[in-house]
Amino acid sequence: MKWFIASDIHGSEYYCKKMINSFESEKADKILFLGDILYHGPRNDLPKDYNPKAVIILLNELKDKILCVRGNCDTDVDQMVLEFPILADYCIITDKDKVIYATHGHNYNENNLPPLQKEIFCCTGTLIYLPATYTKITHI
C-alpha cells in the first residue's frame, strides 16, 4: 500500500487542493493526515485562501481514503463536520514488515520521543525517524 503523508493545511483551500492533486498524481492508496486540518490557531496568521468550509467538502469526498490523527489545532467541533475520525492522538499502522507510529508532533516529537521498540518508525507532522538510531529519514 502506498501512503501519502500530509499535515498542517490549517483550513487553506489552496493547500488542500495542492495536497489532493499531489495525492492523485502520486497514485497513493491512502492519505495519512497528521492533523491541523481546519483551524489556523491563535498564534498563526490566516493561511493562503483560508476557507475551512471548502476544505470540509474536499476532504469529506475522500473520507474512505483518509487516516487522521489530531493536531494541536483540531477540536471536537472540527470532528462534528468531518466524516472521518480526527481526534486520536496517534495511530499505529502495520504495512508489510513495517510498523509506523504516527502523531502530529505536539506531544511526541524529535525532542520527546515516544517509548517505542527500535524497529518502529515514528512519523510526526515534520519528521519521520527511527528512534533506535535517531536518524531522520525522508521516506519509508
State each model region's role.
Residues H40-R43, D76-Q79, Y101, E110-N112, ...:
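Short acidic/glycine-rich loop or secondary-structure boundary segments that cap or lie
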Residues V99, H106-I140:
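Conserved beta-sheet core of the metallophosphoesterase superfamily
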Residues L67-V77, T103-L116:
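Hydrophobic transmembrane alpha-helix bundles
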Residues I5, L32, A102-H104, C123:
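Structural motif
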Residues K2-D95:
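Core catalytic region of metal-dependent phosphoesterases/phosphodiesterases
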Residues D8-I9, N72, G105, G125-L127:
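Fold-independent oxyanion-binding glycine-rich loops
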Residues M1-W3, I92-Y101, T135-H139:
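Beta-strand-turn-beta hairpins that frame and shape the catalytic cleft
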